[in-house]
Amino acid sequence: MDVSNTMLLVAVVAAYWLWFQRISRWLKGPRVWPVLGSLPGLIEQRDRMHDWITENLRACGGTYQTCICAVPFLAKKQGLVTVTCDPKNIEHMLKTRFDNYPKGPTWQAVFHDFLGQGIFNSDGDTWLFQRKTAALEFTTRTLRQAMGRWVNRGIKLRFCPILETAQNNYEPVDLQDLILRLTFDNICGLAFGKDTRTCAPGLPENGFASAFDRATEASLQRFILPEFLWRLKKWLGLGLEVSLSRSLGEIDGYLDAVINTRKQELLSQRESGVQRHDDLLSRFMKKKDQSYSETFLRHVALNFILAGRDTSSVALSWFFWLITTHPTVEDKIVREICSVLIETRGTDVSSWTAEPLEFDEVDRLVYLKAALSETLRLYPSVPEDSKHVVNDDILPDGTFVPAGSSVTYSIYAAGRMKSTWGEDCLEFKPERWISPDDGKFVNHDQYRFVAFNAGPRICLGKDLAYLQMKTIAAAVLLRHRLTVAPGHKVEQKMSLTLFMKNGLLVNVHKRDLEVMMKSLVPKERNDVVVLNGKCNGGIGEGVAVNAAVAVAV
């Protein structure tokens, strides 16, 4: 190498080093390395990524900026990532400047093959049209009733018998896998009216369910790889891209058959005047003012399955784990359930487990809803979400975000900040969701509690999710006491969804309801039973009551 080239190389390295020193001082948060940016730290902390992000946010006051590619001209644009958990910043992104923070091209490219332009993967007018159409359906009581039927049938005929078998045989069961199967069956029933039967004795494999899981896994892997690399693998037919292609073929074939059959059924129903189908797919197909393509209908079903399956199953897994480590909370929940059932079904405990809880019974379980909400605060099903910045903007805390960069809001960290939730923010404390004045459930600000998203994109199925979670939780806790299997280690799986890495292996024990009933009904006076620690309230509004309350029997 001649002298001129050597001097040029030294000058380039020196210029880069000066630039790097300047940008390192400008960025705050995790350490930034030359060229690689913050990627080394991200890789090093991959097994505890969400806690690591939370620690950095605490140290930086709720917002920090870093770069994943420390290269001039990229570090402050495409390579720049702003990370925040500040409620004001989250409200700014998800509501105030909603149009400036879409999902963006990266997200859409990753999920396009799987979800197309469905509601979960679209922006702008495409998203708005589907949102308005779906919102009309989610406000109907008939959809809630349909969800209730699928949930209760699955609990009674499959879920509870499997748990009872595990109890009788003294065998541990992976509760996360079992709940995931149950919620998958439920959401498929609600989405397109088909029983996938994945939660059945023997836990059979279902071709559609397996293809759906493989397609989800392959799509999520694309987030880890640079776009040019996964596109190259797709073009060459390598790795999980092969699995994705095959799985999508199976999914499309299954749903096309469902759609074609449903079209014929709906045609016959119109001719006979009998309406039998109330699933989401049928509701879209029955709209007289629209004619949807099979591709659109297929994506409608897939988007709602993806959005609706994991939220409930992941939340319930963490809920049951927390319950095993907080016996006082468990006792309060069981007492609340039993108190409601004494009112609605009497003191014969055999009637309590004969059928799953009905709407009016589930609606009155205030403390249970508080415990589930507290679970979602600490362990949100989707721990991090990201938005693309369309135009230069300044967040409410003064952080400048340039066009072309991305902003990640940490839902996990938002639930663990002392500035938002107090000094006891890391404690599992359902009481923070109950008003000390009247015992009613407290709905915290949606930009502090972001487990169901917020703003125009807030989860349409939030109420259905609570209905499903409360019904399943009540069914389990009413019949069983759970303990984590000896030696089983509960860890977070680093994914877009906060699954447990090793599942949740539990031992199932029988709950003695007679003892609980006697503690709630200690004595009788004439025809009045005195209840201790009951939940009282009208249908649709729960009131947690600690004092003894007399009710006629």
UniProtKB/Swiss-Prot annotation:
The source's domain of life comes to: Eukaryota
Q: Which UniProt keywords apply?
A: Heme, Iron, Membrane, Metal-binding, Monooxygenase, Oxidoreductase, Plant defense, Transmembrane, Transmembrane helix
Q: Where in the cell is it found?
A: Membrane
SUPFAM superfamilies per record = Cytochrome P450
Q: Name one matching Pfam family.
A: p450
* GO BP annotation list: defense response; fatty acid metabolic process
Annotated binding of heme, by residue: 459
Upregulation details from the record are: By abscisic acid (ABA), auxin, wounding and drought, and in etiolated and dark-adapted seedlings.
Could you say which tissues express the protein in this record? Expressed in leaves, stems, flowers and siliques. Expressed at low levels in roots. Expressed in guard cells of cotyledons and leaves.
Q: Which GO terms describe its cellular component?
A: membrane
Q: Enumerate the cofactors the protein uses.
A: heme
Q: How does it sit in the membrane?
A: Single-pass membrane protein
Disulfide-bond pairs as recorded: none
Classification via InterPro entries: Cyt_P450, Cyt_P450_CS, Cyt_P450_E_grp-I, Cyt_P450_sf
List where the protein spans the membrane: 2-20
Q: What is its EC number?
A: 1.14.14.1
Q: Which GO terms describe its molecular function?
A: alkane 1-monooxygenase activity; heme binding; iron ion binding; oxidoreductase activity, acting on paired donors, with incorporation or reduction of molecular oxygen, reduced flavin or flavoprotein as one donor, and incorporation of one atom of oxygen
Give the knockout phenotype. Answer: No visible phenotype under normal growth conditions, but mutant plants have reduced content of cutin, loose cuticle membrane ultrastructure, show increased permeability to water vapor and display enhanced disease severity to a virulent strain of the bacterial pathogen P.syringae.
- In UniProt terms, what function does this protein have? Catalyzes the omega-hydroxylation of various fatty acids (FA). Acts on saturated and unsaturated fatty acids with chain lengths from C12 to C18. Plays a major role in the biosynthesis of extracellular lipids. Involved in the biosynthesis of hydroxylated fatty acids required for cutin biosynthesis, cuticle development and repression of bacterial type III gene expression.
Similarity section: Belongs to the cytochrome P450 family.
State what protein this is by name: Cytochrome P450 86A2
Q: Which organism does this sequence originate in?
A: Arabidopsis thaliana
Source species taxonomy = Eukaryota, Viridiplantae, Streptophyta, Embryophyta, Tracheophyta
